[in-house]
Amino acid sequence: MIQLSEDQIVKVTGDVSSPKGFQAKGVHCGLRYSKKDLGVIISETPAVSAAVYTQSHFQAAPIKVTQDSLKHGPTLKAVIVNSAIANACTGEQGLKDAYTMRESFASQLGIEPELVAVSSTGVIGEHLDMEKIHAGIELLKETPAGSGDFEEAILTTDTVIKQTCYELAIGGKTVTIGGAAKGSGMIHPNMATMLGFVTTDAAIEEKALQKALREITDVSFNQITVDGETSTNDMVLVMANGCAENECLTEDHPDWPVFKKALLLTCEDLAKEIARDGEGATKLIEAQVQGAKNNLDANVIAKKIVGSNLVKTAVYGTDANWGRIIGAIGHSAAQVTAEEVEVYLGGQCLFKNNEPQPFSESIAKEYLEGDEITIVIKMAEGDGNGRAWGCDLTYDYIKINASYRT
């Protein structure tokens, strides 16, 4: 184990099963043709939990069931997740199936149903095959925990699993935070199809955890966009089981800032991996905005840039077309003074004082041939800073989504 100072946060190899007292599993139950499609995270003790959900008017059945679980109390012992079928827009039967899924898994664990969260992702409007779900739950009982199995089970059109892990010191105790996520298309959260699961062995007050998650989600998961589409099933769930045996964290605790920073890093990692793995994507795009009127304006501008199809296609085509960036900034809802906007790409200034600046097209093109592109916007409206992440738009995005159900 790494020896940590009180203000040190270290990224380590790990996932949602790395914090003490957690295990994760994934199996193939038959919802997908061959890949794993049913995953669970289990805590050995009740975990203080917090969640944020999709803002879609068509919230999926599993979202409603998870909300019901957390209404009964702020603790969970497990979450069960299926891929392939979203169980969204499926009426009363879909809601019944989600509750049955919760009860079946709770029964296997010997716990109250309200201690289980439920999540689904996949095709909208199709019902779950409950025989396969029940068979999968039985299979999970006999399946050993395995690194990466849960992460694989929650994927849909994703091309890679998404996981991260950090360690930090709280009051002389080593605390671990692990994360897993899925998301590739329909990504434009407030919350998009994106699921995030974070586990930690820290002891935390529920109110502080829920507030931190909302604040962090706004500057991480809600600052990514792949295609501007929002899903019915988005959810980010955090479970904190206290197995690190630290003094319970509250907002007034001296170690709260370092824990909150580690939680932010965890969510940022997952958010960027989702953006990087956008359907058909070849490049991660990050927009950094400095000197906006406030942080809200900065985040609005940053997300407008990475969400612009014209910017995304220019990046794919390695074309340093700064006019597309200006176009995105220009129709944002933020306060913008044209003469005070500067645009930088790969260290070169492309635009300043409301006019183009001389720059090397060849150097810009070479920079755009990389797989991580950062666009920097400098303003003089105030002290607001913000970031957002997206990806390029390629021909493969159309191919993937034109045949999504076939």
Curated annotation (Swiss-Prot):
GO molecular function per UniProt: glutamate N-acetyltransferase activity; L-glutamate N-acetyltransferase activity
Similarity field: Belongs to the ArgJ family.
Keywords: Acyltransferase, Amino-acid biosynthesis, Arginine biosynthesis, Autocatalytic cleavage, Cytoplasm, Multifunctional enzyme, Transferase
Catalytic activity: N(2)-acetyl-L-ornithine + L-glutamate = N-acetyl-L-glutamate + L-ornithine; L-glutamate + acetyl-CoA = N-acetyl-L-glutamate + CoA + H(+)
Classification via CDD domains: OAT (cd02152)
Active site positions, chain numbering: 193 (nucleophile)
Gene: argJ
Regulation: Feedback inhibition by L-arginine.
Site feature (Cleavage) residues: 192-193
Enzyme Commission no: 2.3.1.35, 2.3.1.1
Subunit structure: Heterotetramer of two alpha and two beta chains.
GO biological process, one term: L-arginine biosynthetic process
InterPro entries tied to this protein: Arg_biosynth_ArgJ, ArgJ-like_dom_sf, ArgJ_beta_C
Residues annotated for substrate binding in this entry: 156, 182, 193, 279, 401, 406
The protein's name in its UniProt record: Arginine biosynthesis bifunctional protein ArgJ
Organism: Bacillus subtilis (strain 168)
Pathway: Amino-acid biosynthesis; L-arginine biosynthesis; L-ornithine and N-acetyl-L-glutamate from L-glutamate and N(2)-acetyl-L-ornithine (cyclic): step 1/1; Amino-acid biosynthesis; L-arginine biosynthesis; N(2)-acetyl-L-ornithine from L-glutamate: step 1/4
Primary subcellular site in the record, as a coarse category: cytoplasm
Swiss-Prot/TrEMBL site (Involved in the stabilization of negative charge on the oxyanion by the formation of the oxyanion hole) positions: 121-122
